[in-house]
């Protein structure tokens, strides 16, 4: 194909991508910004349910107090009950938060009341937690020492003070409320379409030139996706804080939690711009910035803080 014809195809492809991008925008009520999304709530929830079922099957006996586990100790029952109690309070808070946004004039489709809220605990040293689209939540026991007394071992003492665990769970639920999983899939798909458009224009180039262009586009796309991911993490932190206060958990525990998270792995991590998550120090600083408003709301809704 001649260069002019190939160039025209690239231009039309880029115009098509731009039209596709701007015609699939929705307002994020938690930020007020328009964001790209092509995956419906129903589709995302279906995928979330499938992924969650696969995860539970893979974990098998590691799912605390499940049928696959066979037995359920008193400690296991207390742990699962605590997680589910926190989850129920955050579920109610999520519904209330969306209702308040609608009453404030935001136009969006609330999702929290539609979710199939499910909370399970996974016996694993991995310090992790997640909430898939549809409200499917998993808490790994490895996170409990970070949210608990931070003494290097996981015991029931780690769930006596539930506020930091509520911070983690509120953050993960915030991802689901803001459709971050769907938006991540949408942006990945957009990057793939862009890669296809770039590939059309490589035919007349040498192999070395093609490799350079592919590498440059790949780095740019990856950098863009990482930036989206960091932004989503910050959004989920803010939404989680809103849920935390509405559920009457102490918001002041959040900064210390992220300081502890920053110490995992000896504090070694890549630069923030090369990561999908903001630095723990950045997150702790964000929470301190948001804290006066959160404390004021807590006092108005709940009780006086010590």
Name what the model sees in each region.
Residues 160, 174, 178-227:
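Short, low-complexity, glycine-enriched hydrophobic/amphipathic alpha-helices that associate
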Residues 237, 250, 255-306:
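Extracytoplasmic and endomembrane cell-envelope/extracellular-matrix remodeling and assembly machinery
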Residues 2, 14, 19-189, 202, ...:
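Peri-catalytic and regulatory segments of divalent metal-dependent proteins
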